[in-house]
């Protein structure tokens, strides 16, 4: 009976995803060209920093370029330099928290997202990253007990996503609710980017469904809104997707070599 229920849930999840993304087609993207642009910008910003080592903008932008290149340690150093130059920036520096997360310094990441809550008590995306950090360092129970509290509304689909991370909404229901909202096509594409990114991460972390997670993160990476805007979080989605894809491939190769 338990197996049957799980099978039905998996069927419903894949059915929901197929309905929501029925019109979506694959998108090609020149990653080498993207990395080259980041490398060139990194060099220009390094030159700017040499000429003006107190330029917060240059440290900030170079930190971004380095993070987008997957140079998390270097990005962290640049972001921390900003705070050294202007300590008032610490409370609002969520990007530093993301660098800490990918460096697996989860306690520092959780702290950074915690203090950001004092700066912006509406942004549930920040609360999700704190959950992710606490999940990595202390497990699901502590992560859920430590979920930040929000009273004001937030942009879609973050209220839905936050309910999912709290354990009060199933991943498949996030996409059902998005489909039922009757957003315009362009706005729906934007909402789906965020939905795919964080439902994917939820499946990876909480449900340990790494292949399903990879499929959703691929959709976040290929999302038309994400690719056309190239936002900071699309860059994070891109990095996370390829990181998980490599991990899944390594895991699969390990199973093949063991004969299991």
Over which residues does each language-model region extend?
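Register position in tetratricopeptide repeats
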Residues: 68, 102-103, 136, 205, ...
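Residue-level recognition of tetratricopeptide repeat
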Residues: 64, 98, 132-134, 201-202
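Canonical positions in the second alpha-helix
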Residues: 47-48, 81-82, 115-116, 220
């Amino acid at each position: 009976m338990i197996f049957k229920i799980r099978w039905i849930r998996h069927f419903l999840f894949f059915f929901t995803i197929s309905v929501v993304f029925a019109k979506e087609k694959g998108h090609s993207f020149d990653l080498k060209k993207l990395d080259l642009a980041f490398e060139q910008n990194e060099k220009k910003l390094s030159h700017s920093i040499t000429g003006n080592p107190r330029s917060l903008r240059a440290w900030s932008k170079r930190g971004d370029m380095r993070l987008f290149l997957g140079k998390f340690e270097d990005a962290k150093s640049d972001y921390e330099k900003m705070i050294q130059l202007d300590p008032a920036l610490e409370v609002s520096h969520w990007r530093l928290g993301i660098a800490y997360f990918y460096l697996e310094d989860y306690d520092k990441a959780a702290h950074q997202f915690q203090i950001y809550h004092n700066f912006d008590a509406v942004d549930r995306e920040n609360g999700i990253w704190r959950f992710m950090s606490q999940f990595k360092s202390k497990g699901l129970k502590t992560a859920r007990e430590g979920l930040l509290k929000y009273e004001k509304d937030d942009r879609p689909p973050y209220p839905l996503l936050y309910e999912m991370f709290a354990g009060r909404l199933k991943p498949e229901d996030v996409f059902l609710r998005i489909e039922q909202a009757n957003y315009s096509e362009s706005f729906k594409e934007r909402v789906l980017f965020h939905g795919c990114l964080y439902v994917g991460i939820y499946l990876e972390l909480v449900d340990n469904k790494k292949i399903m997670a990879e499929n959703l993160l691929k959709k976040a990476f290929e999302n038309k809104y994400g690719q056309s805007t190239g936002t900071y979080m699309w860059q994070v989605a891109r990095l996370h997707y390829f990181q998980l894809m490599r991990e899944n491939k390594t895991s699969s190769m390990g199973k093949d070599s063991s004969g299991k």
